[in-house]
């Protein structure tokens, strides 16, 4: 164990809590944080230097984003994609299906201006994208294609930039739900993790 960054220090310096995804920049690190110091959404992004010291918050604005979760970026296209889960105060007590209908869980994917560090476009996925979790861009740094697994909808969402330079999205995989006597609705496939092969040919 090299270093511990105490949650109390993060809260005091950035008003953030509930770390999730860690990604490296050229010589620095950003971590998605799902809540503020009191566990309310949307949280933000913790920025660390190469020695794991806190710089502050990475983003300049969260815009209208209601929730945070995973993120990934393609710097050559000046874009970052982020997904949504829920506020720590919502998911920490345990999952309640009714809270999805009360809009306490996410259903959007956000595209960011990576240089400006602020969101610029949102895909509202609706019922096709309930609780979109892991996001992946192609490993090819020139590609604009990305994917996200929507856990509760049990769907795979695909996005890309078209020939006109506009971002588009579509549902490409829909896993059937299965009936269960103890559930009020058919049990979804719950796609919790997705993975792209290193040659970008296969999605797992």
Where do the PLM segments sit?
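Surface-exposed loop and turn segments in beta-propeller and other repeat-based domains
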Residues: 3-15, 58-66, 119-130, 168-189
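Short, conserved, GDST-rich strand-edge loop motifs in beta-rich repeat architectures
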Residues: 32-41, 83-104, 159
């Amino acid at each position: 164990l090299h270093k511990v960054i105490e949650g109390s220090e993060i809260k005091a310096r950035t008003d953030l809590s509930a770390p999730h995804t860690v990604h490296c920049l050229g010589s620095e690190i950003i971590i998605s944080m799902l809540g503020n110091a009191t566990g309310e959404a949307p949280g933000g992004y913790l920025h660390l230097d190469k020695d794991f010291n806190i710089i502050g918050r990475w983003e300049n604005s969260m815009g209208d984003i209601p929730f945070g979760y995973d993120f990934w970026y393609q710097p050559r296209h000046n874009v970052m994609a982020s997904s949504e889960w829920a506020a720590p105060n919502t998911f920490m007590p345990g999952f309640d299906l009714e809270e999805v209908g009360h809009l306490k869980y996410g259903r959007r994917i956000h595209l960011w201006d990576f240089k400006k560090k602020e969101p610029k476009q949102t895909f509202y996925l609706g019922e096709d994208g309930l609780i979109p979790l892991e996001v992946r861009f192609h490993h090819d740094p020139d590609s604009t294609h990305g994917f996200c697994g929507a856990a509760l909808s049990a769907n795979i969402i695909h996005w890309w930039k078209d020939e006109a330079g506009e971002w588009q999205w579509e549902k490409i995989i829909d896993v059937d739900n299965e009936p269960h006597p103890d559930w009020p609705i058919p049990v979804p496939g719950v796609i919790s993790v997705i993975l792209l092969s290193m040659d970008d040919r296969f999605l797992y």
